[in-house]
Amino acid sequence: MEKLVTQQVQNVDPKQSEILNISEIPAENPTETPIISKQKLLEAGVYFGHKASQWHPKMAQFLLKKKRNETHIIDVLKTQKMLEIAYKLVEKFAQKGAKFIFVGTKKQAKKVIEEQAVRTNSIYVSGRWLGGTLTNNRTILSRLKTMENLEKQAAENFQGYTKKEKLAKQKQLAKLQKNLNGIKGLKDVPLFSLIMLVADPLKDAIAVKEARKKGIKIIGITDSNVDPSLVDFGIPANDDSTKSITLIFTVLADAIASAKGGKKLFAYQSDENIILPEDPEKELKQTRYRSNSFEKFARQKNTLKDSQVLKPNTEIQA
């Protein structure tokens, strides 16, 4: 049986550490396969930060000191370590019966949020976050009831209604499904058992604020421009790349699946078994100012050795 030891995560607020019971995370075994290899993290572009002028000072401990083209570079070793801790936290919560709400309304996150939430039988929001989803639960549950009634009527082809009435009801149902399909399960889940997994705490600030108000724990990606105290546990990484978000959220979903005896897709798998999506051309153009300087630097060195690009990680001490 895996031995549990008390560990201290230096870069996590003590209150957050207590909330998430980080002290009960299994000890690291250096001989084990890494949760995701450094090379695969680099391939996913998790290290791309924002322009230095946009940074948040609380993220300094996760960034390399040297900037390229005035752009911050996230320390991949720290991303790797924090992702592994997040995995173990999510797995532990899932084993204890927690339910999860995946949140990612930006274009780069939508697909993976939906896919991994459905895969793990979780709740999700990939479209517009409806204000009051968590804080005005009664209204949301009422809308869900309306949607269920309309779906029953639709199954009977809206029998008894005129053609005009049918069309109106079909439009109403389509709108409700677009906004509420992902949170159907919310009516069966007590809020105190929810854990929020969020792709971008800034983009989905309303969701984060509501979760905070209801005491829901939050685990999310924290890019170089994000205040890490917005979440209970942050994974320092690029939140503007489809590859980066897909990698991280598939790993988090793996933790839920593993807790239920399911298959892991990315976590602790060999690189050749991890197939990442191609980033859209528009997305590549948007992040080019962040990537060009680092890639040029890597080519000049003709290597991605830790000693040249990455600082040693001292995140966790047994």
From Swiss-Prot:
The keyword Iron-sulfur does not apply. One of its GO terms (molecular function) is structural constituent of ribosome. Keywords: Ribonucleoprotein, Ribosomal protein. GO terms for biological process: translation. Signal peptide: none annotated. One of its GO terms (cellular component) is cytosolic small ribosomal subunit. InterPro entries: Ribosomal_uS2, Ribosomal_uS2_bac/mit/plastid, Ribosomal_uS2_flav_dom_sf. Pfam families: Ribosomal_S2. NCBIfam families: rpsB_bact (TIGR01011). Belongs to the universal ribosomal protein uS2 family. HAMAP family: Ribosomal_uS2_B (MF_00291_B). PANTHER family: 30S RIBOSOMAL PROTEIN S2 PROKARYOTIC AND ORGANELLAR (PTHR12534), SMALL RIBOSOMAL SUBUNIT PROTEIN US2M (PTHR12534:SF0). This is Small ribosomal subunit protein uS2. It comes from Mesomycoplasma hyopneumoniae (strain 232) (Mycoplasma hyopneumoniae). The gene is rpsB.
